[in-house]
């Protein structure tokens, strides 16, 4: 009888052992972690344990962004500060030959042809539009017209000019307007035989003063001519 009991208990142990081993078979998790255990309790306990950050980052596949990348990405070529600095420098250099011709040789044919050309204004206009595109933000109009009457306010303009790109675009705007004003002064001087060298020079950096100087010069020249 005792022998039969021993055999039956051994048979139960022999059957239970493979079952336990099958239930405790390790499972490979994403990221290389192993999970062992048996039953629902072990599965829930392991499910509650998060993966280590470095393994979780490896196990998650990257999701590609939808849509195509833009073909024209100027910011990838140069930094914003480099673009603003280059535009500021080259824009200034581009207008200097026209001022030099109007001051050094106002009556030369090459000066008249150069001043009559529209090329510098087209080039400055394209450069200005490019810088304006780079500096534009959703808050640009709100900063410009911060008043409830939709009028510009000084505080909003000051905030706008905190950006180098905005300053560069404003400088190109001034260069184009100043050169156009200097051309008008030059043409008026040629037409009325009035000296314009000093007025054209002032138009480069102090355009309103240059225009006022030309008007004053024209008045003085007219009064002197009438006296003679």
UniProtKB/Swiss-Prot annotation:
The keyword Transmembrane applies. Keywords: Chloroplast, Membrane, Plastid, Transit peptide, Transmembrane, Transmembrane helix. In etiolated seedlings, expressed in roots, coleoptiles and vascular tissues of roots. In root apexes, expressed in quiescent center (QC) and root caps. In field-grown plants, expressed in leaf blades, young stem nodes and the base of axillary buds and adventitious roots derived from the nodes. In reproductive organs, expressed in anthers and pistil of young flowers, lemma of mature flowers and parts of developing grains. It is a multi-pass membrane protein. The keyword Repeat does not apply. 'Mao huzi' means cat whiskers in Chinese. Required for neoxanthin biosynthesis, an intermediary step in abscisic acid (ABA) biosynthesis. Involved in an ABA pathway that acts at or downstream of ethylene receptors and positively regulates root ethylene response. In coleoptiles the MHZ4-dependent ABA pathway acts at or upstream of EIN2 to negatively regulate coleoptile ethylene response. This is Protein MAO HUZI 4, chloroplastic.
